[in-house]
Amino acid sequence: PPYHIIYMKIKEGFTLRDVCGEKVIIAEGLRNLNFSKLINLNESAAYIWNSLQEKEEFTDETIADLLCQEYEVDHATALADAQKLLAEWQEQGLVD
């Protein structure tokens, strides 16, 4: 089947914080009262999260491009990593 581009955006109400040297995403406000855990991010995921805050929407290609610009990684590897990260963020309810 043809490859379909899926546009996503980060849900409102989540903030990246530095907690005791760890990068974590936390839920803020009443909307997310049932959010019972912190989501840890490694350095590259935190870089991506911060970079995506400025974008209205993004795709796995957007993330792959960010990874290629910031780190010495080939596009195919970056795209695979981007797709894995987006799948995790979808599962955790961080992106639409």
Task: Identify the meaning behind each predicted range.
Residues 3-6, 37-96:
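Long, charge-rich, low-complexity alpha-helical segments
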Residues 2-47:
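Acidic, low-complexity/disordered tracts enriched in E/D and polar residues
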